[in-house]
């Protein structure tokens, strides 16, 4: 019985010494068991290395074990375990059930139990307890030593959960974490390790469970050899936590304590002092880094480096692209093998997709060394979404998550048809499950013939029944089921009914045929995982009563804990992984990417359920558990040291200065430390682009990425930028390559691409727009915004997918409709706005809205609680609006005379006729919300009011550009009709926008009712253009003094109008605007009929017509594309507008 340490710094040859020692023992033909004990993740590599040292005949005499493998061997030898092992998934499901049953008994974790990830946290702490040999009884016995209430209650909760977990678990199962505890007991009966010599390698520390196993082995074996990565032995002395080797020296001290307690001999240690070390025999620089990285003081290396390099990049993508180029260069120019290269990072999740994308493009074979979660696998999504459909009452999201898994007998076209219908009509809940066919006809924005619509509706119902039949059967079969076992049985029958096992097998075969080995391996494991999860539910809680929602949660918890481990599909490939999973053997070249602050070294982890103070307190009371975050942070130094000393030939560290969102990233402290040691370190960056053939050669690697660089350089050449001659040779290579010639020709044609098509044939445009042209004024304004958007919307009639929701335009139309009906009700009853009873008016608004809802004219407002709230808001807004309109009318002499005045063939007035220069007549149609009239001095003055649900400003500049024409053309049309049809002398009074709203008043507590009303009136002040006549202004606001709070006017003390603070125009200016609007509309209509469909959106200081345009994916407007330019509209001052208008009219 003895212990021997084999120690040395990284790369000194400790592992090789163990292998050579084993070989020597075999050659000496010593009759004793020879064991190599390594961590589980290194067992495969250790076996491989041992076989390389030993020949095939002698290799069988040695066993390579991990602690887990050792446990299984002993259990097979002496027996003692009859129960099955429960995996992490089963543990989580069992813990979920325990916490649900005890949630009312928990003191601290009652609320936390509902949070996502809590089950995993509890599972982790129980694992920690077991590894530190802590039982529920030990926790309970120590409670009296805990004075602090919060910690005491925490430990009580943990003891309760832990105790019930142990009780329920051991009915049918055993926890994986119990293996080593049982191993300690069974080793007394085992003969396998009697007089054995054991070599223990690649460990930096052990858990208390593992120390207990080692103690037993030390008492049974001939000798245990343990490798320690350290520069010297501590021999039981105090350990400085800041020492990079402190974790190793702590391990040494604990081992020394064990042999001292058991009177076991300590053999003379083997010191592997080397200069240079075996690993770094070909690199003085890497040897220097190993010696000085954590040495104080350190020794500077002043020569230029070639084996250690740094790279600063613009972002993560260019960082990985540069890494790929460097790998290709090393393999191409220096004969390196992909299998000798590793790329690691402290943020694998953030880099994984980028590495996959770039390495595939550069044809670099790679394997990402990580376990894959299964939550996003379509099979798991199918199972969970099927149960979610039933537990969440058939919501759109859950139903289509289920349907879109690709595992049901419904194709994509059928799915799209069904989805469009469901979205358009808000199908949910019982509408899916009742036998009655769907009869809604509004499933598109297009008007279809009755027969076509009937056929499409029949098809939709056929798709619905086919798609929903399996899940409706599942729903029926789950009725009246209460126990977990019954739920599992019904779910299994459902999966078989949709032929899932056969479909999975077909998918595996397809993946293999397409060379997607990793995908095939993943799907090969999924069905077994599903069955294992169901089995563990049945075994652990099968007889317990649960609800469907609980069953869904338990399954979700179980699947979330599963991770699939994949075997590398080939040997010669780059290993990509995280720093914590780095396999240290046989890596010649190492790329560490993302060497940024907060990534490498890793930041302090969150403290978890037990804080650092809690752990310190418990440790002081003799209840030792895992290290606190500060201790782990000190151990991170050793991880950094181990990582930097892994490669034997070449190390490159790279760091981006910004992440994918453009946020600044700082380089890690490691970068500055290494720069101090290596004062002339090889340092590159891609931020400052250098010119020259050598730099261009760096971009020439694999065919695909080089082709992208060729595109960039050809574009520069076309734009007149001088490019390097080498790109001519590159172009020639692709041109002469059969595979690339077609792509190259498409590329060349692409340089002449433009998305513009300025005009189309007049005949075609006539077919699209109709003849004679009959359009609304708002459509004319739309054409002014962008001719192409107009063409797509009104020519091609392209529309958004119809969704069952309430848009702002829908709401606006609804409110207009209610106001119109209310106005006509006033007329019918002979009630004036300024004398109406407000209580009656509010009741009338309620009545009109309720009638609309009863008639289902706006069915959506009855569809949910949210829309009930919207309905209440609409009622409040309309009640506020009718009060406001009444206040406005009380303040003036204008009287409402027309509501929803229409211009159309069957309207109040005929369409507004516009004769083009060709003699053709264009008919404009439209509707005015309200027209108020004033009879004064033999003339009739018009006040035209447009109700708006949003804020709308009146800008002369927009009138000039054809963006704001409606009110002016309506004014012109009414004045013309009054004069020509009725001989009435009409005059412009005002053009106004009235916002329909119920604004929030601030500081309402300190205000009287009158002050509140005044604030609301001021808040909802109308915008527009007023006749510059003080008398007419008085007829609109008879209490005006200074700035009016209802119209955009300010009067001076002498009664005159302050033109600088008012939006006013004289009669002559109104006349000019009438002429200009007609001129502009004629000009726009002629452009329209000539076939102008140019992609030319306007752009102003406050935005562009592209901002809310739904057709951007159609036009693909981009100022980088030839011929794509904004129609820049400069906001003009009013005086500039008047000048410009006069000039145009004079032409």
UniProtKB/Swiss-Prot annotation:
GO terms for biological process: double-strand break repair via homologous recombination. Keywords: 4Fe-4S, ATP-binding, DNA damage, DNA repair, DNA-binding, Exonuclease, Helicase, Hydrolase, Iron, Iron-sulfur, Metal-binding, Nuclease, Nucleotide-binding. Coiled coil: none annotated. Its cofactor is Mg(2+); [4Fe-4S] cluster. Pfam families: ADDB_N, PDDEXK_1. It is an enzyme of class 3 (hydrolase). Its EC number is 3.1.-.-. Belongs to the helicase family. AddB/RexB type 1 subfamily. Heterodimer of AddA and AddB. The heterodimer acts as both an ATP-dependent DNA helicase and an ATP-dependent, dual-direction single-stranded exonuclease. Recognizes the chi site generating a DNA molecule suitable for the initiation of homologous recombination. The AddB subunit has 5' -> 3' nuclease activity but not helicase activity. This is ATP-dependent helicase/deoxyribonuclease subunit B. It comes from Clostridium botulinum (strain Loch Maree / Type A3). The lineage of its organism: Bacteria, Bacillati, Bacillota, Clostridia, Eubacteriales. The gene is addB.
């Amino acid at each position: 019985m003895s212990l021997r340490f084999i120690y040395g710094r990284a790369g000194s040859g400790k592992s090789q010494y163990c292998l050579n020692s084993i070989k020597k023992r075999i050659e000496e033909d010593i009759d004793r068991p020879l064991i190599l004990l390594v961590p589980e993740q290194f067992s495969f590599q250790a076996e491989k290395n041992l076989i390389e040292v030993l020949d095939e005949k002698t290799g069988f005499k040695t066993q390579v074990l991990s602690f887990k493998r050792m446990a299984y061997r002993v259990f097979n030898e002496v027996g003692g375990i009859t129960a099955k092992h429960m995996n992490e998934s089963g543990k989580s499901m069992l813990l979920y059930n325990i916490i649900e049953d005890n949630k009312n008994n928990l003191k601290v974790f009652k609320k936390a139990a509902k949070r996502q990830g809590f089950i995993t946290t509890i599972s982790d702490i129980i694992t920690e307890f077991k590894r530190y040999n802590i039982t529920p009884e030990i926790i309970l016995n120590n409670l009296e030593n805990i004075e602090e209430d919060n910690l005491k209650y925490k430990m009580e909760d943990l003891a309760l959960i832990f105790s019930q977990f142990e009780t329920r678990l051991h009915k049918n199962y055993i926890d994986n974490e119990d293996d080593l505890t049982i191993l300690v007991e069974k080793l007394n009966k085992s003969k396998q390790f009697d007089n054995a010599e054991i070599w223990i390698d690649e460990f930096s520390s052990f858990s208390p469970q593992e120390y207990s196993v080692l103690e037993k082995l030390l008492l049974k074996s001939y000798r245990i050899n343990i490798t320690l990565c350290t520069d010297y032995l501590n021999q039981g002395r105090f350990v400085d936590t800041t020492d990079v080797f402190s974790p190793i020296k702590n391990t040494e001290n604990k081992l020394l304590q064990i042999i001292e307690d058991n009177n076991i001999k300590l053999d003379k240690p083997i010191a592997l002092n080397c200069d240079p070390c075996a690993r770094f025999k070909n690199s003085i620089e890497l040897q220097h880094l190993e010696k000085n990285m954590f040495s104080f003081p350190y020794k500077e290396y002043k020569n230029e480096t070639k084996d250690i390099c740094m790279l600063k990049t613009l972002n993560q993508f260019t960082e990985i692209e540069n890494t790929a180029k460097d790998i290709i260069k090393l393999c191409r120019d220096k004969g390196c093998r992909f299998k000798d290269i590793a790329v690691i990072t402290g943020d694998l999740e953030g880099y994984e997709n980028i590495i996959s994308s770039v390495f595939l493009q550069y044809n670099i074979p790679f394997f990402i060394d990580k376990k894959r979660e299964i939550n996003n696998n379509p099979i798991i999504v199918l199972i969970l979404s099927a149960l979610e459909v039933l537990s969440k009452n058939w919501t759109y999201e859950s139903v289509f998550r289920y349907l879109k898994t690709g595992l049901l007998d419904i194709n994509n076209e059928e799915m799209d048809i069904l989805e469009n219908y469901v979205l358009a009509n808000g199908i949910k809940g019982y509408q899916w499950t009742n036998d009655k066919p769907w009869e809604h006809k509004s499933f598109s924005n297009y008007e279809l013939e009755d027969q076509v619509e009937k056929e499409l509706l029949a098809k939709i119902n056929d798709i619905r029944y086919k798609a929903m039949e399996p899940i409706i059967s599942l729903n029926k079969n789950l009725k009246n089921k209460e126990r977990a076992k019954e739920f599992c049985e019904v779910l299994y029958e459902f999966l078989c009914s949709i032929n899932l096992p056969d479909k999975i097998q077909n998918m595996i075969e397809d993946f293999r045929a397409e060379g997607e080995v990793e995908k095939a391996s993943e799907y090969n494991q999924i069905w077994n995982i599903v069955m294992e999860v169901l089995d563990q539910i049945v075994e652990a809680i099968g007889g317990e009563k649960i609800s469907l929602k609980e069953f869904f949660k338990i399954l979700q918890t179980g699947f979330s804990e599963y991770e699939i481990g994949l075997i590398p599909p080939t040997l010669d490939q780059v290993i990509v992984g995280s720093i914590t999973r780095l396999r240290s053997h046989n890596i010649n070249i190492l790329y560490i990417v993302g060497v940024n602050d907060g990534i490498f070294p890793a930041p302090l982890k969150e403290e978890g359920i037990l804080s650092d103070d809690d752990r310190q307190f418990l440790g002081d009371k003799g209840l030792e558990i895992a290290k606190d975050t500060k201790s782990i942070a000190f151990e991170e130094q050793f991880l950094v040291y181990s990582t930097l000393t892994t490669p034997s030939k070449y190390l490159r560290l790279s760091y981006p200065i910004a992440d994918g969102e453009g946020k600044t990233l700082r380089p890690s402290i490691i970068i500055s430390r290494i720069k101090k040691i290596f004062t002339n370190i090889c340092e590159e960056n891609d931020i400052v682009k250098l010119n020259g053939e050598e730099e261009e050669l760096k971009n020439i690697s694999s065919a695909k990425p080089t082709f992208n660089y060729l595109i960039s350089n050809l574009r520069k050449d076309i734009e007149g930028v001088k490019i390097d001659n080498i790109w001519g040779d590159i172009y020639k290579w692709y041109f002469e390559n059969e595979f690339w010639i077609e792509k190259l020709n498409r590329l060349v044609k692409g340089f002449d691409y433009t998305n513009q098509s300025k005009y189309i044939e007049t005949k075609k445009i006539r077919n699209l727009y109709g003849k004679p042209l009959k359009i609304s004024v708002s459509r004319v304004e739309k054409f002014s915004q962008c001719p192409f958007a107009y063409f797509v919307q009104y020519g091609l009639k392209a529309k958004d997918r119809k969704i069952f929701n309430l848009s702002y335009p829908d709401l606006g139309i609804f409110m207009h409709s209610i106001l119109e009906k209310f106005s006509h009700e006033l007329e019918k009853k002979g009630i004036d706005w300024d004398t109406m009873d407000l209580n009656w008016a509010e009741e009338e608004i309620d009545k009109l809205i309720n009638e609309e809802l009863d008639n289902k004219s706006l069915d959506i407002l009855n569809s949910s609680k949210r829309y009930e709230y919207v309905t209440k808001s609409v009622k409040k807004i309309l009640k506020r609006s009718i009060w406001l309109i009444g206040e406005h009318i009380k303040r003036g002499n204008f009287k409402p005379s027309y509501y929803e005045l229409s211009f159309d063939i069957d309207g109040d007035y005929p369409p507004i006729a516009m004769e083009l220069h060709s003699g053709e007549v264009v008919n404009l149609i439209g509707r005015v919300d309200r027209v108020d009239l004033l009879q004064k001095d033999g003339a009739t003055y018009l006040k035209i009011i447009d109700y708006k649900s949003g804020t709308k400003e009146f800008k002369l500049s927009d009138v000039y550009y054809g963006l704001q024409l409606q009110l002016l053309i309506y004014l012109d049309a009414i004045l013309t009709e009054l004069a020509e049809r009725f001989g009435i002398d009409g005059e412009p009074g005002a053009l106004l926008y009235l916002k329909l709203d119920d604004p929030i008043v601030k500081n309402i507590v300190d205000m009287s009712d009158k002050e509140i009303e005044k604030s609301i009136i001021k808040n909802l002040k109308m915008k527009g253009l007023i006749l510059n006549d003080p008398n007419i202004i008085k007829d609109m606001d008879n209490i005006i003094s200074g700035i009016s709070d209802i119209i955009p006017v300010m009067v001076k003390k002498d009664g005159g109008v302050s033109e600088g603070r008012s939006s006013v125009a004289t009669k002559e200016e109104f006349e000019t605007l009438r002429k200009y609007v007609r001129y502009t509309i004629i000009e726009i209509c002629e452009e329209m009929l000539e076939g102008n469909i140019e992609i030319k959106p306007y752009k102003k200081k406050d935005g562009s017509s592209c901002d809310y345009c739904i057709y951007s994916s159609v036009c693909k407007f981009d100022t980088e594309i030839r011929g794509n330019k904004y129609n820049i509209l400069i906001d003009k001052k009013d005086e500039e507008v008047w000048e410009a208008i006069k000039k145009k009219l004079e032409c």
